[in-house]
């Protein structure tokens, strides 16, 4: 039991940070660490140099009750690209240290961890897993391509050639200096007092069952209660780029299931020859002269003829979506006269692209929008690269003077909020249409949270931001509040934004949006679509009905369908409607711990998973926070159709993830 609780405690702390930035802090870089072509590197093009990148906050490693190191797991992705394809520099290491960064460290064979004076000193309290690409006789290295476990010094107490064991148990070599992405997993078991290290290639379809290194030793004498974690690398007479893609730390010894895209890292930069430099300088001088002449002519003609000024800045080159000319949009919208509506960030106009019959919707960001540029950048950098059938497609953008424009596919049926509530002379949505809309938006959110290369938090899920196409398919739009994150990073943001009634309570308290706050808003969205009612309905001057609370009350009274509009409730849909209402209450629960993630929501709506029998007891329980700290995830109890599980009140209804 103490091991389980200890694992939970360290999990809750360590799960808060991953990759290079997180809610608690950042990787603090020292020495030659920096960035090259958008990738974090521990070393640059300098010889005999070292670089370090350490978390800026301490990590508790020990169970205070018995002063033993608790179980933990570390997974990180790296690549090493040396200037000589056949010869490495010195290498890199994952380091657990009592200090943030290691002062007085040396480069070359010491990997930026130790120096000649303190190498092997028992007072160091340093644990390292080295990825060594240089054979140093003084440390007993077996070759120039090996992995080792080091305690307080550079002489490895456990080592092996770099490689992995395939499914048949056969050893396969891996080159640490190939320049390709490699994965290292470090697992320590408190119970078995065993440290396992596995090296593998993310390109393989399986994860090795057998570790490369296995050290049977209690780490408690060497690791203090509070430590720092990070990475270090060094160069010698040969230089190399040591790339860090991402890293993850968790409590327990389970290997996280990580599905990342595999990038191609840039090779070591080649030095230019003297002749090349002379030609380059001469060419640049000539180009500069021509540019000056051209600029003078351009200014002259600009002042005489050009009336529309469109500035193409550096950030626009990297955004991806097509840039439209202002004149093109002006003509398409007939001078911005076909107004479709007005939202929190500007007006939306209908248009038809010149030379085609393609209809578009153009959003013009208002002049008085204080965060106009910020929201504009967020939207084009996010939705412009997303491709999903239930997301509104961004065709391109335009910037004219101080005005910002976004060009979308035109949705002829407008926004969903126009169809939800009973209005005179308006056809009501059938239950089948409502259920399909719910599943469409669930699929879109699952894509944003779990299936794209980066995690996207929408932050403003509501019927007004759901558009209906000509086939009555629902598409999620308005990414003006969206936030983008690398996979594996803690997806949180510090600015409270969104529509008030859809904002989760923890977002109001902490100001940090997560995938869980999106799930909360989606739960309310499900209730609003299913019931055909607004979230807040005023029955009398002094009587307001909160839809989520009322639905739960109807459920407690034994008839959850009482919350539904009469025209919907009387359709032949009782079981399906009851499922959606219960799932909506669950997703919009005040306690983050029992909300399912969107992948589970999609499976439940599709009939692949079922809700537990005692879900009402779980929703009503008051001690959810205590469950999340002491119990296993309840989603593991969710069973396939035909085998409904029963949950106890000591299990949280979520899995710890992004």
From Swiss-Prot:
Gene3D superfamilies associated with the record = 2.60.120.200, Phosphorylase Kinase, domain 1, Transferase(Phosphotransferase) domain 1
- Signal peptide range equals 1-25
| Superkingdom classification of source | Eukaryota
**Record's keyword annotation contains Kinase:** yes
Protein name listed in UniProt: L-type lectin-domain containing receptor kinase V.4
- Identify the EC number(s): 2.7.11.1
What single Pfam family name could you report for this chain, choosing any that match? Pkinase
- Locate the transmembrane regions by residue number: 281-301
Per UniProt, residues of the Protein kinase domain are 334-592
Q: Where is this region: Legume-lectin like?
A: 26-248
**SMART domains, sorted:** S_TKc (SM00220)
Top-level EC class as recorded in UniProt: transferase
Q: Which InterPro entries match?
A: ConA-like_dom_sf, Kinase-like_dom_sf, L-type_Lectin-RKs, Legume_lectin_dom, Prot_kinase_dom, Protein_kinase_ATP_BS, Ser/Thr_kinase_AS
**Cytoplasmic domain ranges by topology:** 302-658
Q: Which family does it belong to?
A: In the C-terminal section; belongs to the protein kinase superfamily. Ser/Thr protein kinase family.
GO CC, alphabetical: plasma membrane
Keyword Transmembrane helix, does the record have it? yes
Question: What species does this protein belong to?
Answer: Arabidopsis thaliana
């Amino acid at each position: 039991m103490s091991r389980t609780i200890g694992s939970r405690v360290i999990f809750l702390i360590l799960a808060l940070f991953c990759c290079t930035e997180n809610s608690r802090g950042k990787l603090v870089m020292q020495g030659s660490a920096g960035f090259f072509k958008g990738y974090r590197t521990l070393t640059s093009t300098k010889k005999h140099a070292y670089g370090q990148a350490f978390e800026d906050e301490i990590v508790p490693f020990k169970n205070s009750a018995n002063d033993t190191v608790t179980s933990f797991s570390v997974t990180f992705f790296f690549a090493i690209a040396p200037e000589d394809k056949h010869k490495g520099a010195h290498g890199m290491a994952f380091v657990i240290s009592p200090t943030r960064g290691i002062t007085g460290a040396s480069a070359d064979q010491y990997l930026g961890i130790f120096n000649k004076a303190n190498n092997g000193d028992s007072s160091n309290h340093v644990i390292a897993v080295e990825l060594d690409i240089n054979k140093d006789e003084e440390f007993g290295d077996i070759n120039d391509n090996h992995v080792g476990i080091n305690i307080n010094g550079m002489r490895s107490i456990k080592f092996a050639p770099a490689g992995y064991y395939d499914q048949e148990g056969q050893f396969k070599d891996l080159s640490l200096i190939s320049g390709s992405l490699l994965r290292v997993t470090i697992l320590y078991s408190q119970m078995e007092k065993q440290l396992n290290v596995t090296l593998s290639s993310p390109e393989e379809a399986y994860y090795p069952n057998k570790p490369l290194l296995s050290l049977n030793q209690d780490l408690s004498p060497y690791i203090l209660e509070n430590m720092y974690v990070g990475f270090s690398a060094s160069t010698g007479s040969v230089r190399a780029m040591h790339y860090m893609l991402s890293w993850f730390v968790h409590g327990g010894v389970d290997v996280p299931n990580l599905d990342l895209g595999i990038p191609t890292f840039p090779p070591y930069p080649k030095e230019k020859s003297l002749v090349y430099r002379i030609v380059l300088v001469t060419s640049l001088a000539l180009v500069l002269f021509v540019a000056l002449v051209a600029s003078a002519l351009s200014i002259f003609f600009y002042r005489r003829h050009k009336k529309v000024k469109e500035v193409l800045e550096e950030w626009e080159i990297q955004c991806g979506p097509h840039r439209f000319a202002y004149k093109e949009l002006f003509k398409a919208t007939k001078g911005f006269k076909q107004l479709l509506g007005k939202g929190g960030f500007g007006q939306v106009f209908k248009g038809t692209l010149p030379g085609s019959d393609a209809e578009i919707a153009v959003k013009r960001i208002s002049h008085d929008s204080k965060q106009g540029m910020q929201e504009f950048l967020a939207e084009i950098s996010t939705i412009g690269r997303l491709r999903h059938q239930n997301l509104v497609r961004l065709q391109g953008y335009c910037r004219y003077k101080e005005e910002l424009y976004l060009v979308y596919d035109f949705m002829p049926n407008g926004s969903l909020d126009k169809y939800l509530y009973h209005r005179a002379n308006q056809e009501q949505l059938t239950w089948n249409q409502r259920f399909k809309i719910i599943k469409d938006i669930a699929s879109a959110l699952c894509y944003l949270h779990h299936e794209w290369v980066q995690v996207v938090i929408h932050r403003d899920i509501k019927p007004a931001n759901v558009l209906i196409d000509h086939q009555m398919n629902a598409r999620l739009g308005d990414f003006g509040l969206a936030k983008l994150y690398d996979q594996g990073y803690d997806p949180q943001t510090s600015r409270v934004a969104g529509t008030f009634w859809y904002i989760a309570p923890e977002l109001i308290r902490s100001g940090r949006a997560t995938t869980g706050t999106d799930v909360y808003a989606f739960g309310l969205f499900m209730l609003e679509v299913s019931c055909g009612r607004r979230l807040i309905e005023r029955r009398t001057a002094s009587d307001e009905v909160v839809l989520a609370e009322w639905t739960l009350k109807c459920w407690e009274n034994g008839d959850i369908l009482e919350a539904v509009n009469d025209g919907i409730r009387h359709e032949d849909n009782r079981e399906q409607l009851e499922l959606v209402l219960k799932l909506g209450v669950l997703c919009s629960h005040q306690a983050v711990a029992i909300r399912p993630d969107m992948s589970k929501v999609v499976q439940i709506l599709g009939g692949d998973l079922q809700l537990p029998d005692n879900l009402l007891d779980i929703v009503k329980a008051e001690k959810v926070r205590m469950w999340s700290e002491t119990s296993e995830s309840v989603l593991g109890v969710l069973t396939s159709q035909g085998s409904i599980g029963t949950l106890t009140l000591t299990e949280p209804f979520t899995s710890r993830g992004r």
